[in-house]
Amino acid sequence: MIRRRPLLALPFALPFASVALPGCGDQGKASEDAAFDAVDLAKEIVARDVEQVRKGMPEGVKVLQKRMPSDPLGSRLELQTAIKAARENTDSLQIAKSTFFSFATPDGLVLRSEIDPDRLVDQNILKAFPGLAKALEPNAGLVEAYGQLEALRGVRKGDDLAWVVAHAVPAKEGDKPAGLFLSGWSFRLYARVMQEGVRQKLIERTKTSEKKEIPVVYPYFLKSGGAYGDPDAPDVNAEQLVKLEAGSKAQSADFRTHIEIEKRTFGIAAKKEPLFGDDSAIAVVASVF
C-alpha cells in the first residue's frame, strides 16, 4: 500500500519549458526510442499492480466480513482494525499499491479507512462516484469508477484523478449488503510508483548491457483528456502531452514524437491502456543525454 509521504523532488526531475519541433536528429530518434521502450515497461508494472487490486478485493471482502463489528457505525476503531486485517491477510492486497482501503455504508457514507489521518471518513463516496452503487446489486462483483474527490487527491495543487474499486461486503445476517469495501489510488501518487518501477527496470538492464546510460523518464496516465504524472514531475510535461492530444491519438495507433526543451531533446511515446477504459493510455516523456 502506498503511504502518504512528503512530496520530495526526485534526483532526475528537471524543470523546463517546451516547444514542439519537427525533428532534432539522432538524439530525437534515440529519445523517442527510449520513451517508446519505457512505455512497455510502465505497462508491465501497471498490469501487475491492477491485477493485485482486482484479484485481492474479493478475497479481502471475505476477511472483512468475518472481522466486521456488529455495529460498524458505533465501533469505528474496531472497523479500522477489520479493514487492516482484510488487507494484511490477503496476499494480493498485502503488496497492492492502493492509496486507500475503506469501508462505506450502503448509502455511501465512509465510516473508516485503514490509515490515519483519514481524509475520506464521513465523505459520501456514492455522491462523488454514483456508478459504484452497482456494486450493491446481487452478484455484481467488482465495480470501478474514475473521478475526482478532494479527499482522494494525491497532490496539493494541480489536476489529479482517482481510480476507485468497490465490492459489496455481505451482511452476516440477511440478504442485503453490509456496505462496500473500497480501494484504489490517486493516479498522481501511483505515477510515482510507476516512475520508480520503470527507472529500476532500466537500472537492472545496465547490469547485463554494454549501454550504461539511463535515460530520464517521466511516465504518465492519460485519461479523458488529462495527463497525470509523478507529483514532482515538471508541470510542462503534462501540459505538452495534453497539447499534443497524445491520449486520443494513441487510441488508434501508437503515438511517438520528440520535442526540444531548453536546448535538450525529449522523446514522447504513448500507447493505449485498455485496463482503464477506452479513453486511456500510458505515456512516457524521456531524454537520452
What are these regions (language model features)?
Residues 80-95, 173, 180-229:
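Solvent-exposed, extracytoplasmic
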Residues 4-8:
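N-terminal export leaders
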Residues 11-19:
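Bacterial N-terminal signal peptides
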Residues 89-140, 154-155, 224-243:
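Extracellular/periplasmic ligand-sensing ectodomains of membrane signal-transduction proteins
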Residues 80, 158-202, 269-271, 278-289:
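Conserved beta-strands of PAS-like sensory domains
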Residues 234-289:
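Extracellular/periplasmic juxtamembrane segments that couple receptor/chemosensory ectodomains to their
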Residues 113-183, 258-262:
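Extracytoplasmic/periplasmic ligand-binding sensor regions of membrane-associated signaling proteins
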Residues 24-77, 95, 160-165, 177, ...:
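Juxtamembrane extracytoplasmic/periplasmic/luminal helical "stalk" adjacent to the first N-terminal
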